[in-house]
Amino acid sequence: MGQKVNPNGIRLGYIRDWRSTWYADSSRYATKLNEDIKVREFLHKKLAAAAVSKIQIERPAQNAKITIHTARSGIVIGKKGEDVEKLRAEVHKLMGIPVQINIEEVRKPEIDAKLVAESVAQQLEKRVMFRRAMKKAMQAAMKSGAKGIKIMVSGRLGGAEIARSEWARDGRVPLQTFRADVDYATAEALTTYGVIGVKVWIYKGEILPGQIAEKKNNKKRS
């Protein structure tokens, strides 16, 4: 029987990069990992209205470089960069080292799995029918250039007594192909009937090893 694995984790080191890039010896590893978890939790909570897709953390020397990928960069930056400065000071308190915060705008939130999952979850919390929410998200993703999308919702759907899972797919989503650029994310909808889980897979096309090398070189230049 086939076993399901996280589509992001299985592609790490091949077409995906780690979201935390730093080195630590065995005595400091757990402390730094715990810091990363706390920083991510703090930022996701603080920037709940900013549609944050992912947070990358780098630790060059005795500093920290945090890149926030968001669909609403204006909310994070604030007037004349005031909000981002406050954020930097708060993260500095958490980590205890100098912190640099960079903001990267998500150009197409319709094909970002995390943002799509959170959007569907928010609609479920507002009592929108799950099939309508799924259909709307899939149509928007396919219009924005996705090659395929699959959405699954699990829980007491529509207030049913027995929890169940429902899913819908448009296009193709190849989970077995390592070079397939499949974005995967989950979210939770807190409804009056209980928690409803949302899973989203978005296929954006194939990435070849040469293309990955080009991306890394471009990052180093910038």
Curated annotation (Swiss-Prot):
Residues 39-107 form the KH type-2 domain. GO terms for cellular component: cytosolic small ribosomal subunit. SMART domains: KH (SM00322). GO terms for biological process: translation. It comes from the Bacteria. One of its GO terms (molecular function) is mRNA binding. The keyword Ribonucleoprotein applies. Keywords: Ribonucleoprotein, Ribosomal protein, RNA-binding, rRNA-binding. It holds the Pfam family KH_2. Part of the 30S ribosomal subunit. Forms a tight complex with proteins S10 and S14. HAMAP family: Ribosomal_uS3_B. Belongs to the universal ribosomal protein uS3 family. PANTHER family: 30S/40S RIBOSOMAL PROTEIN S3, SMALL RIBOSOMAL SUBUNIT PROTEIN US3C. Binds the lower part of the 30S subunit head. Binds mRNA in the 70S ribosome, positioning it for translation. This is Small ribosomal subunit protein uS3.
